[in-house]
Amino acid sequence: MSIMSISLHSASSDTVSLTSRRTISTSKHWAAIFDERIYQICNIVHPGLPIDNAAVEHIRYFLQSIVFELIEARATSVVEVDKTAKKLFAFGLQTVCKEAWDNMHQQLQKHKYQKALKTVLESQHRLAAVIKETLGPREKEKKDREKKEIERIACYIYYACESVTEDVLRLTGNYVKNIRNSEQKITMANLDVAMNGDKALMELRTKLRNEEEAESPGGFGFLSEFEEFVAEETEEKTLSNSQTYESVAVDFLRDERRFIRELNRINVFRRRIESVAATDVDKQIVCNLFGNLTEIHDLALKIERTLEDAIELSDTQCIGMGIWEHGEAYEFDTYTFYIRRDGGEMNETRHATYVINDNIKALLESERFASLFQSGEHYLGSSLDGQSFRLAVQYVLPQLLHIPIFHIYQYHEYITRLHQLSSSEEDRRDLNDCRSAFERVVGCVSDMSPELKTKITQFLDQQAKSEKIYNVKRLNEIQSSIDGFTGSPIGKTCNELEKDGDLGMIRPSLQFSSEITKNKKWKTERFVYIFDQMIVLCKRHRNTLKFKDRLAVHSIDVFDIPDSEVTNCFKIESHDKSSLPKIYHFVCKNPEEKRQWMAVLVKVTTKSVLDRILDNHEKEEAKRIPLVVPGPDQYRFSEPDTEDNISFEDYTSSSGIPVIKCGTVLKLIERLTYHSYTDSKYILTFLISYRSFCTPNDLFSLLLERFNIPTPKKLQQPKQGGGPLAGRYDTVQSHGLSAISSSSCINPLCEQKFRKEFQQPIQLRVLSVINQWVKLHWYDFQCDPVLLDALELFLNRCCDPREGLSKQHKKFCKTILALIEKRVKNPPGIMQQPNENGDKGAADEGHVNSAFVFGDDQQHPPQHQVYTNESPKETNQVLWHTAQKGDVDHYDLLTLHPIEIGRQLTLLHSDLYRAIQPIELVEAAWTKAEKWRKSPQLLRLTDHSTLLTYWVSRSIVETESLEERMAMFNRVLEVMSVFEELHNFTGLVAFYSALNSSCIFRLKWCWDGLDNEKKKCFDRFNTLCERRWQEMQKRLSSINPPCIPFFGHYLSNIYFLEQGNSTFVNKSPPHGAAGAQKQQKDDLKASDPENSNKQFKQLVSFLKLRKISNVIREIQIFQDQRYSLTLEPTIRQFFESINPKNDFKSNEDLEEYLYNKSLEIQPKGLDTPTAELKPKHNASTLRSPGVKPPKAAGNHYSANHPIGLHLHSQNSHSAPHAMSSQSSTVPNTPLSAHETKRSLSHNQDDAPLQQFVDIRFERKGTHPKIPVLQPPPLLPRSSRANQSNSVSLPPTTQAPMPPAPKSSGMMSTATSPTTLTTTTTPSSAGGPPPKLHPRRMTQQPMSPLAKSPLTPSRDNSSPSAFQFPVVYEASTAPPLPPRPSTSSDVSSSPSTSGSTSSATKENQEQLRVIFDREESHSPTVRLSVPLPPALPPPRGSSVFRAPPPLPPKSNRHNSNSPTLSSEQPFEDPMSPSIFVNTPPPPLPPKTYRSSNK
């Protein structure tokens, strides 16, 4: 049976036993009692160490078993429960009962409960309900009398469970931190190993189970991960890595800390023995036994600090100088005094070994110490009963007392190795002096006890082997050498071999007695292996070992047999429940051999108990030494937590870290760099959203202030030195002294604790936050050179040795400086591409701008115009229909291959989507006045989506042939299917919006001509784009990147979170729109630099910021991966150049034109089509090539996943992150009286569109405007010239193009593009439709990122990545060209275009697609939708469920409405006057449609 199955059986057996014990409540009820407290205790014991949900569940089951065991006896008083608990926790966990009793009385004595006890009290009330149900119905008098008693019982049991949880988590956390090559997280496997490695917990688990258990302690041992590890390679690697001065110093420090822990273990014995030493004779025995260990402990602490300072703070090799300072003071003579003891009747000098043996013998034989070995109730409530403690004193304590002697040789060895590796002559000289001092002590040991050298050599070998992972090979070799070995593998159960050898054993068939030796065959031979968790008994047979038995260490007891019965004999008794009790009597050859075997056996059986006592001792010492921090007058971040400056959620994170609800800026910065833990999720959220309440300069100033921690005033007092016995850990409890001056011993330790636990952790976390800031949000420094210079100055100053920072701090600073240098030379997202000659020039830049960089410094490898997630192995073939490559003038919806249209648009949308940065989404920046500066990439994506919708609509309505229009309808649906397969929901919604526009949706002849397959396809798209986008959210949660989600859903969520919640928390905020406006004014005042102090005192709603950041992180999920598709430059250029709005003064004019064209091709009231016109395209063009790529072509998809009209099941893809379905703000329009719902559409929701104009950014003195490109005309070039047109067309007055400004700044004159000039054609009512004016040049394919404000345009390369401009307070915003205004705006004069009323109208503008509006009132797409209130109505109200319908727009042909005249002057959108005087309108949120309309 494997260890995995055993450990899983252990967890399941707990559950089964729980079920068999009358399970009263559900697991959800027990989770409410224990889970939250488990997380909190984990954070207290091991701050920042996460714990797995499975581990929490296992601990909960364990605590449930304890509760049922305590209440199963149906006790009616706390005293009875306490007696039951003492029986249950009889071995090793007696502190549980004591702490539970003390905490219960402490809680009951309080009359007013603090807020912190709220969760505890609620859990106790739930536990009391369980106890009441267990006790059953009672009489009323007894019920009233027992009511308070039951509450006390619940309180006692609850605190007992807390104490057990603390022990389990502390033990498991220590195991996780010490294990190598393991995830720093408490998992189920780690928890099982740690609990099975502790004897006390194993005994408790054995008592709680009803089933029989496997004999193995189970669990995945530390060495089980290295079964295939090669010992020789590991040893060679370890030795090679250790041959440096720094690595030897680190090993030296590790062993010194281990030595200090062993001294503390000796102190555990000393404190217990001193507790019963009353007379002077007894005190003299104790003094002679332990000698001057206090001075040795004090010297070890000094050497530990010396090594720490030399490793962390010094850049030079100076260990010799620090240690020799102690040597010059003759402090190493302390070891000489410890080895040479003054004792005996003649006060002669004796060796420590003899003195230790004599005093232990006197201690064991003294009647005054007899009570120490009889009672089970002792100091610290230790689990060692009388007999166990006697064996520990007799066999374990002598070995511990010899460790200081062994440690002298470790000193000598490390000093010698450092002397060989040191490159400093001064350090070598000091190390040589230290070595001479230690050699004198070593010589003293050799002269007095030559036989001790053997023990010292064995000790040093064991210490060295304990560090080698290749021990697992030794364990596997031992197991393979045992014939017939059964049970779990040794390597998965044990970590090291303690001792092995031959032992005589009394035959089990004989009855043990003092006369047994008279039998000739009374003894047999056994070869015994003692591991840390197991004893294996074997028998030699020729040249092999036969397996006989195995005993678990946690289930055995060791007994010493007096020599009066059998000489040199001891007994091992096993109490494993899986089999009958086993008793083995072993006989040794001599007393020394017996002492060695007994010492090892007692050590392995009592190790967990001694460790537990030692942990309690160290915890008590840690409480005695307070953590002194600067006061609020010295350090603003030391202000205590109150309700006025910070508040937390009622729940905690999975790692036990409290979740912040709101707090002041200072408190947010404090928790951002907290000394006890690191919350990575909080750091990411803070860096995304901090601009809502402070500027980057403010954040950097606060981080600098947080980094510069002053020394507390209490630690600045002059230190008072104590006497030679005033050691740092010298306590009243340890020596029984009446009074000791605390200033001499506590002050140095307080200073060390302040530096280790407060100052250094905070400084490291500040550097960590700066590192994340530079790595993930480089644009803050890119657009502010002053901030970047200040950061570099700070990091260079930290690297200065005079600052006294540790090496870890300096290394961190150098890493950040290297990252800054890399960002400056090669900003994130810029990648070089081969030029025409195949070389990668320095100025050549790629298309993709990776807005979010994950990892150290993600730079994508150069690719030959291929966008891929990984290194391209196989790229798809570009597919062509009837259009020829490079003939851009003939590209349209029918001539291009539908698959290639979907691919190239997907690549374009992917670049636009991935270029969006978090700063563009914070505070709904796309709706503010400076939206084109703050959210350029976001607006570029929505702008292109809107243009694509208009392009599809115009392509259809300008096609006069019905056959050709039906082919376009089919082609649009095919492209949408390609979008669906490529997970491009942005393109899919754009095409869907075109089909649902009023001018296309009314084309009944085209819709009726679709076959059933196409109708089903459209119905599927209609469901996918339904009102609340629920189906699309389900689709997103079940697919893997790459993907391009529809961005409007995210914008709606962010907008309502911004408008519906205030950034700053007020005591009683006003409600409604007026309250929101007042709060926005308060936020603006708070952001004013003059009110920065006031701002830092306001409470920031971090709950709101966390929700917004969660939405942004959902966006980031799909920004990290790209498509493995081949870029076709000419098709990319074509779709970048489309501009169906270039001939119209406003969007309404374009929409009116589209609707009139729709009426022309299908007049109202005409049910059947008239005479069919001849298509302009030939039959091969009209015939669809299909959407299944050829098999020979390499494709992004597998062969069994073709692109087709039918969407394959997406459930096969695993969802990286489930995305919540939230209500969209898509406006819908009621059906007209003349039209009915179409059967092929299940939902007539409008697709949200956004209106944008191709805005050109210009910064004075930097670079020229981006040129205009020539798109292909959508109208026939010759055949339509003579055709009559009854539809009135908008005027086609040609506005003069502004000249290109002179290049300066980053652009040179040679690289400045020139604009194209076009001739004007007078328009007439009967003339042909206007041709599309050019928007961009056609020489080079353009990237969507080329329109960034600071990005220059180059002739032979793609434009660079986006860079934010530097905005100074004194400078004005760059002039922005206008977007086409509404008719009301056109009629207004330029002088009033910047007025308040005009701005208000522009802010209320939003593009909506209305496909079911009554024709007599709304013949086209409507604009000018009013904004909803700033604060949305409360959820659940009637207003929220059914907002009022939008009022219909007045008829455009009404005489009262403003009209456009051909004589009316119209300025071009690129005109400089409009560029300055007309600010662009922001994008308001979308509105709801009434469900009952």
Curated annotation (Swiss-Prot):
> What quaternary structure, including any partners, is listed in this protein's UniProt entry?
Interacts with cmd-1 in the presence of Ca(2+).
The Ras-GEF domain, residue ranges: 897-1164
The record's keywords, sorted A to Z, are: Guanine-nucleotide releasing factor
Q: What's noted about domains in the record?
A: The DH (DBL-homology) domain may inhibit the Ras-GEF domain, thereby preventing excessive let-60/Ras activation.
The free-text function statement in the UniProt record for this protein reads: Promotes the exchange of Ras-bound GDP by GTP. May regulate signaling pathways downstream of receptor tyrosine kinase, egl-15 and let-23. Required for larval and male spicule development, fluid homeostasis, vulva induction, spermatogenesis, and oogenesis by promoting meiosis prophase exit during oocyte maturation. Required for the delamination of G1 cell by promoting the loss of cell junctions and detachment from the excretory system during larval development. Plays a role in nicotinic acetylcholine receptor (nAChR)-mediated sensitivity to nicotine.
Q: Which PANTHER family does this chain map to? A: GUANINE NUCLEOTIDE EXCHANGE FACTOR (PTHR23113), PROTEIN SON OF SEVENLESS (PTHR23113:SF363)
Q: Which Pfam families match?
A: RasGEF (PF00617), RasGEF_N (PF00618), SOS1_NGEF_PH (PF22697)
Domain named N-terminal Ras-GEF: residues? 656-824
Residue ranges, compositional bias (Low complexity)? 1308-1326, 1381-1400
Tell me the superkingdom of the source: Eukaryota
An example Gene Ontology biological process:
Ras protein signal transduction
SMART domains with a match to the protein in the record: PH, RasGEF, RasGEFN, RhoGEF
Coiled-coil boundaries: none
The region called Disordered is annotated at 1067-1091, 1165-1248, 1263-1493
User: Which InterPro entries does the UniProt entry name for this protein?
Assistant: DBL_dom_sf, DH_dom, Histone-fold, PH-like_dom_sf, PH_domain, Ras-like_GEF, Ras-like_Gua-exchang_fac_N, Ras_GEF_dom_sf
Q: Which residues form the PH domain?
A: 496-606
Which is an annotated GO molecular function term of this record?
guanyl-nucleotide exchange factor activity
- In the UniProt record, does the keyword Transport occur? no
Q: What is this protein called?
A: Son of sevenless homolog
Q: Per the record, what is the consequence of mutating G322R?
A: In sy262; restores normal vulva induction in let-23 sy-1 mutant
- Compositionally skewed regions (Polar residues) per UniProt: 1208-1231, 1279-1289, 1350-1361, 1453-1464
